[in-house]
């Protein structure tokens, strides 16, 4: 017996795939989140991007999320994702997309540069947390929730914003943003924002 495919479901899958491709999703993510065939996804990708999808495996190491800058970006994305999920505004891949759009709004990339946290990596992060490989831990200094390895001791964790590595401080001194160089300017900007 042949199962008949729903035209409406196929249209929804095509729309979802187009949105994911526009945000930079890799083929493996498209295959996982839609019911479209690999051939149709490749054809759609080529039509939208003008080139075939990149080849290669998905990132599978949790270590990428632990380096200081990647951790800050990943934590920002995941907190937005968690808020959307808990508030019941959306779920599943829709929550990933909305949280990723919020992340891009808050962390705009320089012209010609890709965002530090790619959509596929953000999607992988959600899967790592769901599978118990990563978790959110509260910083004992600022109270912010940050991505850490699972089973991290709950007390004593200090985030990389409160305790940046020395290379972050060196990079900050080279920044063209005055608020990055002169801490008092940053404090004033924070007070005005509050």
Curated annotation (Swiss-Prot):
BP terms from Gene Ontology: bacterial-type flagellum organization; positive regulation of DNA-templated transcription; regulation of bacterial-type flagellum assembly
Cofactor annotation comment: Binds 1 zinc ion per subunit.
Molecular function terms from GO: DNA binding; zinc ion binding
InterPro entries assigned: FlhC (IPR007944)
Keyword Calcium attached: no
Binding residues for Zn(2+): 139, 142, 159, 162
Summary of subunit composition and partner proteins: Heterohexamer composed of two FlhC and four FlhD subunits. Each FlhC binds a FlhD dimer, forming a heterotrimer, and a hexamer assembles by dimerization of two heterotrimers.
Name recorded for this polypeptide: Flagellar transcriptional regulator FlhC
């Amino acid at each position: 017996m042949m199962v008949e495919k729903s035209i409406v479901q196929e249209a929804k899958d095509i729309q979802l795939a187009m949105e994911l491709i526009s945000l930079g999703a890799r083929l493996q993510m498209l295959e996982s989140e839609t019911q479209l065939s690999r051939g149709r996804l490749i054809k759609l990708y080529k039509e939208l991007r003008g080139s075939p999808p990149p080849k290669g495996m998905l990132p599978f190491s949790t270590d990428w999320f632990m380096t200081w800058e990647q951790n800050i970006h990943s934590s920002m994305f995941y907190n937005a994702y968690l808020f959307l999920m808990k508030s019941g505004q959306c779920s599943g891949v829709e929550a990933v997309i909305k949280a990723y759009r919020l992340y891009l709004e808050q962390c705009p990339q320089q012209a010609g540069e890709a965002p530090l946290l790619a959509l596929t990596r953000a999607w992988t992060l959600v899967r790592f947390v769901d599978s118990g490989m990563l978790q959110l831990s509260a910083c004992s200094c600022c109270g912010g929730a940050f991505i850490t390895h699972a089973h991290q001791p709950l007390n004593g964790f200090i985030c990389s914003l409160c305790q940046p590595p020395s290379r972050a401080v060196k990079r900050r001194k080279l920044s063209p943003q005055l608020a990055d160089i002169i801490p008092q300017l940053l404090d004033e900007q924070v007070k005005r924002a509050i």
